[in-house]
Every structure is written in structure tokens, then in C-alpha cells.
Amino acid sequence: MPPCPPQPNRNRLPQLPTGELGEMELTWQEIMSITELQGLNVPSEPSFEPQAPTPYPGPLPPPTYCPCSIHPDAGFTLPPPPYELPASTPHAPDLPYSYGNIAIPVSKPLTLSGLLNEPLPDPLALLDIGLPVGQPKPQEDPESDSGLSLNYSDAESLELEGTEAGRRRSEYVDMYPVEYPYSLMPNSLAHPNYTLPPTETPLVLESSSGPVRAKPAVRGEAGSRDERRALAMKIPFPTDKIVNLPVDDFNELLAQYPLTESQLALVRDIRRRGKNKVAAQNCRKRKLETIVQLERELERLGSERERLLRARGEADRTLEVMRQQLTELYHDIFQHLRDESGNSYSPEEYVLQQAADGAIFLVPRGTKMEATD
């Protein structure tokens, strides 16, 4: 906090004695001399006497540099510089500047030898700055005929864009080559030629067809094989008649045409395998019908079970109601029963039992009444 400035209408000197004022000035001068010797930068407060202004030292002399080439030869090593930048001047001491309570130190002077000895960045690392990190994003199939894709484009336009982008990249490399002022590497690495990685071709995923049933294909092959064999053997009637005709009609058909032994053997083989095929189809049909009937019977039994469960629940509820009514009637009867003294019977000590003839008796608990015919 800065000290309060003195007011013009008030005199501060008469407030302190003359002896104490002189001692304070001497003490203050000693403190200032100690801080100057130690090189400390302590914010000073205005003293009672004004200080003399310090003379202006004048501008600093500009440094001079020796002429040197910026681009030295590849096989020439630069000698150390004959001089360095002046580290400090007598007129401007290297003390940290103070702004309030913050001290800012002065950086060390830079020298030309330090700049030359500093390692240059790796050219491969500089090239990686402009390249994208990670694997390139795979492009979509240009031959896709899906009209729902938002990134849909023709294959020809993609090829034109690819060639245009490659041409622009090559022109950019030609216009802005990578050069370095100091070649501290061999001549092969002084001017490297970098080739861009080839663009990955999009993977075309073929749509897998659904599962193909083997049995229908076998049946079709068998039918076509029988037809081919019949045509090769010059059978005069189609294979459908051979398989589907009854026995009598089939025998009459064979009697109408004069056939050789090989033709008869082929016809009988075709009929046998066709009948086996029809029998297998009928067997599968009967199995499917049986499965359907069993499913229907199972559904019927499930619905019947649910109906019986509902009926059992209703019977249990009815039985519970009857038990409650019987208990109420039991207590009501015991309330009306009296002994010879006029006292009521306790239902915990006596029970009501009915005989075979319908008579009701009041007996103590634990005793059994003999059944009377």
C-alpha cells in the first residue's frame, strides 16, 4: 500500500522533536546503503529530502558482426566465431526488473556459436507434422448402387478427384520444396525426396448369399439325370408316365413299345427310384401331419389345464367361505347352549358330534362317541 502523501495545509515537522528527526534520517540512509551494497531491489519510499537525479548514460553502441555466408558448402565446417555478443555493459547492469512485487529476470545473451551448435530438427519429424495421424479412413465402395447413402458419388468423379488431388499435391511439393540452411547430414539426406503413401483401395465386400438347401438341388439333379438318361437311351415316353402310372397302365405302356433289355432296365430303375421318392415324400407328409396334430393336442391340453386350475381356485374359495360360515354357526350354537346351572359351554372344551341317525350330541373334547346303527 503506498504511503499517504502529505497534506499541504498541515506541517509534519512540528509533530516530532528535532533530535528524533535527525536520528530517523541517519537510520534511513544506513538502510539504503546496505540495500545498495547487497544488490537488492527494494521499493523505496520517498524520503524527507529530494534525491539528486541520475545522469543519462547515453545510447548503447551497436554491435558489429563479421561477414559470413548463410549457405556454407556441404563439406565445409564453420569455424567458431571470433567474437560473441556483449553479455553486459557498464551502464546497464543485468539486474532483474521489478514491477511492483514481481521480479522478471533478464535472459542470457544469445551467441552465434550457440545457435550453430544447437541441433536441427529431424526432417522426418517435420514431414510428419503435415501428415494425418492414424490410419486413413477407408473410402466407401464407389460402385455401390445404394441411393440411400449420403456420400454416394460416381466412380468416374472419384477417379477425377483422386487425380486432381494427386496433381495438386505434386505441384505443392514442387513449389515449396523442403530445404534447410545448414546441412549437418550427408548429401543423401540433405535434400530428401519423400513419396506420399499410396491410397488404399477400398475393400469390396461381396454380399454372402443365403443358405442353399442341398436336397432340392439333388432332387432337380436326379430328375434331370433321369431325363438325360432316358433321352440317351431313346425311351419313347416321358419319365412322368414311368413314375406316376399305376401298375396295370404301366404294364400296358411297356407292351405297346418294343424295348430292349437295357431300356427296360433303365425304365424299371427310373420307376423304382421315383416310387421311393414318392414314398419318402408321403412319409414326410405324414410325419408333418402327425407333428401338427400333436401341437394342436398340446394346445388343447394346455387350455384344459388352465380351465381346471381356474375351477380349482374357485372351489378353494368356496370351501373357505363355507368353513367361515361353519365356524360362525358353531360359535352361535355354543352361545345358545346352557348347562343345568345356566352357564354356557366353551367351544374349546366341548365339541358337537353327529350320530348316524342324524342326532347331534355335545361331548367333551378327546372322547369319541360310539357309532350307533
From Swiss-Prot:
Location of the region described as Transactivation domain in the Swiss-Prot/TrEMBL record: 1-206
Chain segments carrying region Required for interaction with MAPK8: 1-83
Subcellular location: Nucleus, PML body; Cytoplasm
Modified-residue entries (Phosphoserine), positions: 157, 170
Region Basic motif, residue ranges: 268-287
Chain location of the short sequence motif PXY motif 1 per the record: 61-65
GO cellular component: cytoplasm; nucleus; PML body; protein-DNA complex; RNA polymerase II transcription regulator complex
Keywords noted in UniProt: Activator, Cytoplasm, DNA-binding, Isopeptide bond, Nucleus, Phosphoprotein, Transcription, Transcription regulation, Ubl conjugation
PTM comment, free text: Phosphorylated on serine residues. In undifferentiated erythrocytes, phosphorylated by MAPK8 which then leads to ubiquitination and protein degradation.
Stretches assigned to the bZIP domain: 266-329
Molecular-function annotations in GO: DNA binding; DNA-binding transcription factor activity, RNA polymerase II-specific; identical protein binding; RNA polymerase II cis-regulatory region sequence-specific DNA binding; sequence-specific double-stranded DNA binding; WW domain binding
InterPro entries for the chain: bZIP, bZIP_Maf, bZIP_sf, NFE2-like, TF_DNA-bd_sf
Cross-link (Glycyl lysine isopeptide (Lys-Gly) (interchain with G-Cter in SUMO)): 368
Highest taxon of source: Eukaryota
Region annotation Disordered: where it falls in the sequence: 1-22, 40-60, 131-163, 206-225
Cited function: Component of the NF-E2 complex essential for regulating erythroid and megakaryocytic maturation and differentiation. Binds to the hypersensitive site 2 (HS2) of the beta-globin control region (LCR). This subunit (NFE2) recognizes the TCAT/C sequence of the AP-1-like core palindrome present in a number of erythroid and megakaryocytic gene promoters. Requires MAFK or other small MAF proteins for binding to the NF-E2 motif. May play a role in all aspects of hemoglobin production from globin and heme synthesis to procurement of iron.
Annotated family: Belongs to the bZIP family. CNC subfamily.
Entry comment, domain topic: The PXY motifs are required for binding WW domains. PXY1 is required to promote transactivation of beta-globin and for hyperacetylation of histone H3, but not for binding to the HS2 promoter site.
Subunit structure: Homodimer; can bind DNA as a homodimer. Erythroid transcription activator nuclear factor erythroid-derived 2 (NF-E2), composed of a heterodimer of NFE2 and MAFK, possesses transactivation activity on beta-globin. Also forms high affinity heterodimer with MAFG; the interaction promotes erythropoiesis. Interacts (via the PXY motif 1) with ITCH (via the WW 1 domain); the interaction promotes 'Lys63'-linked ubiquitination of NFE2, translocates it to the cytoplasm and inhibits its transactivation activity.
Protein name: Transcription factor NF-E2 45 kDa subunit
Annotated organism of origin: Rattus norvegicus (Rat)
